Amino acid sequence: MHITDKTHSSKIPIIHGDLFTFIDDHIHGGNNGCSIIIPHVCNNINSFGAGFAAAVANRFPIVKENYHLLGSKILGRTQFIEVFKNKTFGHSLIFANMISQNGAISSKNPRPLNYASLCQSMIMVSKFIREKFDKDQSVQI
């Protein structure tokens, strides 16, 4: 898939199979590899362990451990955790815990995603990429 607008061009990979296999192939891929940032939405009630978060916690427990260190009143914050760095090629795997969900889904809270917080978190991810990586480095999100 190729997306183009007037000023930018971006290739979005379509992944078939296990996301974590794709990640391993790219961060260990030598000169053909790249750094990968995995932004994902988290809630603000210190609950990390369902859905995608459960898969992350099983494979990279440090992501969950760091999330639990945040405390309360964190809606709109983004926490970056580097879980791997390829010392030979400099490729990193970084998770971005975007605290953009206010509570959990329930009958009283059917849509807990807070769009203002999500926007704020996405801006933080964008700033992080610009500050951490050189313009010529390959980064996938």
Task: Specify the residue positions occupied by each region the protein language model found.
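Macrodomain-like recognition of ADP-ribose-binding/processing modules
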Residues: M1-Q140
